């Protein structure tokens, strides 16, 4: 099985405008979907990400608050999945709850040792 990182890109304004009930609904949808992924053997891990972070760049290690302060999008969470191929993950990702609130999923294959040869 190959590993894939599923990044959840979310609209900052849209997410901040959700009511507490909508946020609870979103969380419950993610919990249910994660359960389905676990049952099928595809889920390795996953979690939400706090928008308050830092970025460190360059050889001088310049530190800035928040990785994308000027962006309208943020990476709000991730799922680490395993599957036979990327096509399987694409089909799984189509059911990700973040799409219900206008989010985008990005699939990135995790490199294996043989990929470096």
Predicted regions and their residues:
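Conserved, structured core segments of small domains
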Residues: 1-117
